[in-house]
Amino acid sequence: MKNEMLALILAGGQGTRLGKLTQSIAKPAVQFGGRYRIIDFALSNCANSGIHNVGVVTQYQPLALNNHIGNGSSWGLDGINSGVSILQPYSASEGNRWFEGTSHAIYQNIDYIDNVNPEYVLILSGDHIYKMDYDDMLQSHKDNNASLTVAVLDVPLKEASRFGIMNTDANNRIVEFEEKPAQPKSTKASMGIYIFDWQRLRNMLVAAEKSKVGMSDFGKNVIPNYLESGESVYAYEFSGYWKDVGTIESLWEANMEYISPENALDSRNRQWKIYSRNLISPPNFLGANAHVEDSLVVDGCFVDGTVKHSILSRGAQVREGAEVLDSVIMSGAIIGQGAKIKRAIIGEGAIISDGVEIDGTDEVQVVGYNEVVGVATDED
């Protein structure tokens, strides 16, 4: 039986610009907002959009990501007619090949896609923070009788040169694609979200592989090929909150924006929930010296210091006399007695020893996964 649309989430990126935070995990597995990992947003969008089959394409350091996703039950994707499949590079008869790019990762998983038998494939990045109804985008794709639909976001002209820019006609048909142009003609930036008619994309990828034509990347190769071939390629304009958290500064900024109950992501909207793996933790403990304001504090935290405009993830500790300001403290991290943290991201399981000061006033500071700063005590 043919399924209407299969979602494929590209989640194999290393995220080198996140430095210490991705030395041992893939970027989509990095924590966000105290309770989530970045990939939760794409997975939740799929679940809320009524997509029942999702493939997650992994490559770099996939263990934490695989454990987090599990069988997809946290997103309601573990039913008889639904599921999440983890797609990793594998050795085939022609030899072992790593994914060489975004579209090459899709080509390497043709057998899986054919088995699902979709009419359309939705290609997503697993490293953006946003809410989006993919069903609306699919309807636009159908209405335009498009071969390819690209989700675009209007960006300030001064920032347009950082993105792949789509130049369109009056009907939103894409007539030209420019990758990070020095002099952009448009402000419609690609979000890295695509809907393809599967058979057309399949035929193009197979033909390119047989002829040894480089077709490894959607932005650099596939979209230009579609335009040159005269395929009907349309833009789908998205106007909601969308954040690329590929740098330390942007990740910190997105977390700080998320703190507000009236944040642009509309995180408290119960009609479009963001789901995540639900780990059971004990209740929070606020000690006699605890002072917490304008902050998000998740289950299992121990606080006996001062926390202002910050996020404490599951099981984080802020001990007596410690001060945390404008910072993100990830799961299991410990801020020792008298330590002072300002404008920083403290990675999972990290230990900031007693009296240590970390000041990110000039540049957001980062402490890596399980990193120890200062001299740890037996209590840590």
Swiss-Prot record:
It comes from Streptococcus pneumoniae serotype 2 (strain D39 / NCTC 7466). It comes from the Bacteria. GO terms for biological process: glycogen biosynthetic process. Keywords: ATP-binding, Carbohydrate metabolism, Glycogen biosynthesis, Glycogen metabolism, Nucleotide-binding, Nucleotidyltransferase, Transferase. Involved in the biosynthesis of ADP-glucose, a building block required for the elongation reactions to produce glycogen. Catalyzes the reaction between ATP and alpha-D-glucose 1-phosphate (G1P) to produce pyrophosphate and ADP-Glc. Alpha-D-glucose 1-phosphate binds at residues 164, 179-180, 190. The gene is glgC. It holds the Pfam family NTP_transferase. This is Glucose-1-phosphate adenylyltransferase. Transmembrane segments: none annotated. The keyword Transferase applies. PANTHER family: GLUCOSE-1-PHOSPHATE ADENYLYLTRANSFERASE (PTHR43523:SF2), GLUCOSE-1-PHOSPHATE ADENYLYLTRANSFERASE-RELATED (PTHR43523). InterPro entries: ADP-Glc_PPase (IPR011831), ADP_Glu_pyroP_CS (IPR005836), GlgC_bac (IPR023049), GlmU/GlgC-like_hexapep (IPR056818), NTP_transferase_dom (IPR005835), Nucleotide-diphossugar_trans (IPR029044), Trimer_LpxA-like_sf (IPR011004). It is an enzyme of class 2 (transferase). Pathway: Glycan biosynthesis; glycogen biosynthesis.
